[in-house]
């Protein structure tokens, strides 16, 4: 048990330092054939101002207890509904993402009311994504895993690999419910 606590503490520390490492899951929830060089080319010039990133609303989402009504980290906000929510950057940008084999990697954290990491070690959650400002293969996502930290409570974690920078719509799918957001991936 002690070993698992250290493992999840490391996951949260990495998130705090915004130096998330590459996705470690061996399995992918989406099987995509390797992209050809022409598929990997950006067809649109990067224009972050034209990307409709998801911003905090005037009436922000407040998660149900036992979760804090305030996002656990400065510069981030809760986004979604009780059936599925996530934590997003207030400026809608993912910066300085590590690259692994030519793709940008990020870890996404998700929650849903009643989720317990101890009883659902492999959460019913998949993540998909598509680039909005140019052509690119879809993102690849790891199989969802579970986690717990005092600041975050029970959470679901999915690693994503994005083949290009640019404007991306990312969608979480869980038990018939979908939640989408738009983020700018800084090159």
Regions found by a protein language model. Give the residues of each.
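Contiguous segments within soluble domain cores/interaction surfaces
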Residues: 28-163, 167-187
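Bacterial signal peptide processing site
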Residues: 21-23
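C-terminal motif of bacterial Sec signal peptides marking the signal peptidase cleavage site
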Residues: 16-19
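Bacterial N-terminal signal peptides that target proteins for export
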Residues: 1-8
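Sec-dependent N-terminal signal peptides
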Residues: 8-14
């Amino acid at each position: 048990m002690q070993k698992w606590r250290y493992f999840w503490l490391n996951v949260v520390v990495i998130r705090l330092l915004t130096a998330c490492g590459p996705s470690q899951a061996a399995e992918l929830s989406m099987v995509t054939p390797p992209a050809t060089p022409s598929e990997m080319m950006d067809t649109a010039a990067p224009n972050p101002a034209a990307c409709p990133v998801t911003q905090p609303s005037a009436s922000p989402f407040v998660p149900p207890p036992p979760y804090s009504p305030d996002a656990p980290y400065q510069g981030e906000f809760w986004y979604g509904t009780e059936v599925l929510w996530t934590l997003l950057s207030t400026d809608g940008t993912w910066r300085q993402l590590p690259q692994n084999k030519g793709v940008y990697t990020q870890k996404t954290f998700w929650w849903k009311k009643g989720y317990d990491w101890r009883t659902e070690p492999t959460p019913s959650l998949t993540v998909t994504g598509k680039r909005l400002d140019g052509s690119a293969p879809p993102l690849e996502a790891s199989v969802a895993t579970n986690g717990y930290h005092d600041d975050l409570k029970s959470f679901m974690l999915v690693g994503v690999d994005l083949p290009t920078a640019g404007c991306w719509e990312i969608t979480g799918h869980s038990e018939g419910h979908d939640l989408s957001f738009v983020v700018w991936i800084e090159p």
